[in-house]
């Protein structure tokens, strides 16, 4: 794996920013660190990039304990970069290349990847927020690192800028980059990431493949006036859960397994006639809420 995190803990006085957080990031993944503001996402990335020191725990990058030489192989965007607004995009990248000790001939390549090559001579003051963020990602790509670390890369952007950055991240993934990114946006993780770790108040709630952690459970919504309706619903096999929504009962099933005909037949065989049956999906927001409410 590209990154192994083992029992990281960090406190700020009485506040526990991270508590025994462990996970691994496989090569080629877009790994989302998902959580609301204050969940510990930025603290975690700052520890990984050696900006902060953990109270306890350890991590390895590219199979080695984090060190200066390893971090030179990683492109990082943890906050708004310090670009010079009176210089052009290309001139700003020349400064970044010198700091990173990268060949300036790489600038043309990263500008094209970021989609701002045609504005390379324009002063940064004329760039939109989305273009500035793409320039920041272009700076991360100097030297062609295999691993990229982004902290909320679409934060503060308009819908067009968000779409541009997400498309760029997907393109970088397709080119074989491993990307570790923090986000508080559930739909962003679903659309962009292959793997996810969910943080809440410094605790790791779940980690794994996005399709496994953020599954869209099937819901069969049913109703009957029969006196045994609830008893039969509770005995329904293969369901993963049951809840009430007003006059209806909602039966939860693993994604892709709900079968209205099978449910209807089961109730009929038990002597209960359903007056209403409908298959829906549990929203991703509901799933996320359930995970975070376990704390």
Where are these regions (language model features)?
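ABC transporter nucleotide-binding domains
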Residues: 3, 10-181, 186-200, 206
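Non-catalytic surface loops within mature trypsin-like serine protease
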Residues: 27, 118, 224-226, 255, ...
